[in-house]
Amino acid sequence: MLSSQLSAYLAEMNLSATEQQQGQLVGFVEMLNKWNKAYNLTSVRSPEQMLIRHVMDSLTVSPYLSGKRFIDVGTGPGLPGIPLAIMNPDKEFVLLDSLGKRIRFQKQVQFELKINNISSVESRVEAFQPEIKFDGVLSRAFASVQDMLTWCHHLPHNEGIFYALKGQLNQVELEAIPEGFELLETIVLQVPQLDEQRHLLKLRKKLG
């Protein structure tokens, strides 16, 4: 059931996935559903809704990623990082979260589904100091763009991109972008079977 739904959603989004990738995406939903009963990783309870609200919602960003190395901050159970890693095996994803149970889940997913391009780090974002800066910083969890840029400013290299996944756009929030950063693009995202607003904001440090 999940497999056929996933195939239909991917086709609707013009995303192509191998049989292995589709199996990994379905496996991720099944593991999330199983672990959620004991560890309360998400408020979404049904696998069908997890597929739409978590996996497909995450994958809407996939066509807009540029670069090789990404960090997903406040990733929770691995969103959007794990679905994006499955669909982009040529890219590397660091999944950052401060809660141990979420990191344990991610590591189990990595082991069971054999996802080789993710690494999980248990840390608060402001305390994490990467040896090599990232091409992109991803977030779908931060309360505001301002918080994301303030707490994550040290993570990308000078030309790296901040990818903020948002629901409805808040004009006040957009006007409060901190000094030294610029909004490059606002992209309207369409998630299959989800009648809610979704946007991707691409930002970076001002150059020069």
UniProtKB/Swiss-Prot annotation:
InterPro entries: rRNA_ssu_MeTfrase_G (IPR003682), SAM-dependent_MTases_sf (IPR029063). One of its GO terms (molecular function) is rRNA (guanine-N7-)-methyltransferase activity. Pfam families: GidB (PF02527). It is an enzyme of class 2 (transferase). Keywords: Cytoplasm, Methyltransferase, rRNA processing, S-adenosyl-L-methionine, Transferase. S-adenosyl-L-methionine binds at G74, L79, V125, E126, R140. It catalyses: guanosine(527) in 16S rRNA + S-adenosyl-L-methionine = N(7)-methylguanosine(527) in 16S rRNA + S-adenosyl-L-homocysteine. Its EC number is 2.1.1.170. Its main location: cytoplasm. It comes from the Bacteria. GO terms for cellular component: cytosol. It is found in: Cytoplasm. Belongs to the methyltransferase superfamily. RNA methyltransferase RsmG family. Specifically methylates the N7 position of guanine in position 527 of 16S rRNA. PANTHER family: S-ADENOSYL-L-METHIONINE-DEPENDENT METHYLTRANSFERASES SUPERFAMILY PROTEIN. This is Ribosomal RNA small subunit methyltransferase G. It comes from Shewanella denitrificans (strain OS217 / ATCC BAA-1090 / DSM 15013).
